[in-house]
A protein has these predicted regions:
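Catalytic-loop of the protein kinase fold
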Residues: 152-169
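Juxta-kinase regulatory segment immediately upstream of eukaryotic protein kinase catalytic domains
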Residues: 1-23
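Conserved HxN/HPN-centered segment at the entrance to the catalytic loop
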Residues: 76, 82-103
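ATP-binding glycine-rich loop module of kinase domains
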Residues: 33-80
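Conserved C-lobe activation region of Hanks-type protein kinase-like domains
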Residues: 218-223, 232-288
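Activation segment signature within eukaryotic-like protein kinase domains
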Residues: 140-141
């Protein structure tokens, strides 16, 4: 395929495409290839190339239009985030197309986007191996909260906040990546008709009962809040929140079918309360009472099973209740406390 043989080519902007890293399935099911790339100034970047050959070979104009639409939207939303100076979101260094001389038109044109080269992601750094620095974990989680808030402030909801989508860079900086399936308040996203666009295994529990709130665009923030709290829970406990919650709820119901969200909600709350008690005890053992109380409050409010009572209940208006300001502040406070108490 054209996108798998770009090594040695140079883009119009001067980036040299170096070694191939891997092939992946892109956000819209398109075939993507990842490379290291070097700028004219010697900066190392990460290049994601999109191969349109699958869409072209399908013989379907609809498939081709959808594929191009998804790519153009991702490029547009990334450029928008860059222009808005979203410091905790991964934005492009360059984008465009490169001609592969080994193929004929139109297959020879390969679209690409280049990003800063990351050192890893939260899954590789903190889940797949033993955590050696909790202060770095909390710093990363603070950055994630800031990144989600930045997206919300410019009318974007991510809905796929998970460890592999949080990239780690030099100087212990973390940023949110993979904006290919986000939705926006202007309705430009090709995925606007979907109530949830991310990984279902990390999704809030209401999704599993087809009870996702859908009255207003801001309701999509319920998912981002839950996924942020779930990320905190995952990094500390080592397990994903939603699958455990569903399993424990089924045990409470003696494995009877969970027919509706409303019927399951009392059992979900009971199971969630037990999980939060266990989470608090684990945090207290690891970090002490003060920090564990803050972490318990954050996760409980962000992941509460009844989404109508999720977020900062001090406020009744959604724009304030679904704001991450309180939780960003608390994560900053936890960072300071780990430093003061000598927790590494």
């Amino acid at each position: 395929m054209p996108a798998t043989s770009l090594e040695g080519l140079v883009t119009n902007s001067g980036w040299t495409i170096n070694k191939l890293i891997k092939n992946t399935s892109g956000s819209g099911g398109n075939f993507c290839t990842q490379y290291e790339a070097t700028s004219p100034e010697g900066k190392t970047g990460f290049l994601k190339a999109m191969d349109l050959s699958n869409a072209l070979n399908s013989g379907s104009l609809e498939v081709l239009q959808r594929t191009v639409s998804e790519y153009l939207f991702e490029q547009e939303i990334l450029n928008h985030c860059r222009d808005q100076n979203l410091s905790k979101v991964v934005v492009p260094l360059d984008s465009g197309s490169v001609i592969n001389p080994n193929f004929v038109q139109p297959l020879n044109q390969v679209y690409y986007i280049i990003f800063d080269f990351a050192e890893g992601d939260l899954r590789k750094e903190y889940i797949n191996k033993e955590i050696t620095s909790w202060s770095k974990v909390f710093r990363s989680l603070h950055h994630v909260g800031v990144g989600i808030k930045q997206l919300h402030n410019v009318g974007i909801v991510h809905q796929d906040i998970k460890p592999s989508n949080i990239l780690c860079f030099a100087n212990d900086e973390s940023k949110i990546s993979d904006l290919g399936r986000v939705t926006d308040d202007k309705g430009k996203s090709p995925f606007s008709q979907l109530t949830f666009t991310g990984d279902r295994s990390y999704a809030p529990v209401e999704l599993h009962f087809n009870a996702i709130p859908r009255d207003d665009f801001i309701d999509r923030r319920y998912s981002d809040l839950h996924m942020y709290g779930s990320l905190i829970y995952h990094l500390i406990s080592g397990v994903q929140l939603t699958p455990i919650l569903i399993n424990q709820t089924r045990e409470l119901m003696s494995n009877a079918p969970l027919t509706s969200y409303e019927e399951a909600l009392p059992f979900l709350k009971l199971a969630f309360g037990k999980m939060m008690e266990e989470f608090y005890n684990k945090c207290e053992e690891e970090f002490g009472e003060d920090i564990s109380s803050e972490l318990h409050e954050i996760v409980k409010e962000l992941c509460y099973p009844d989404y109508k009572y999720r977020g900062n209940l001090k406020y009744s208006r959604k724009v304030q209740r679904l704001s991450l300001e309180k939780y960003i502040s608390k994560m900053a406070s936890i960072q300071r406390k780990t430093y003061i108490t000598g927790i590494n």
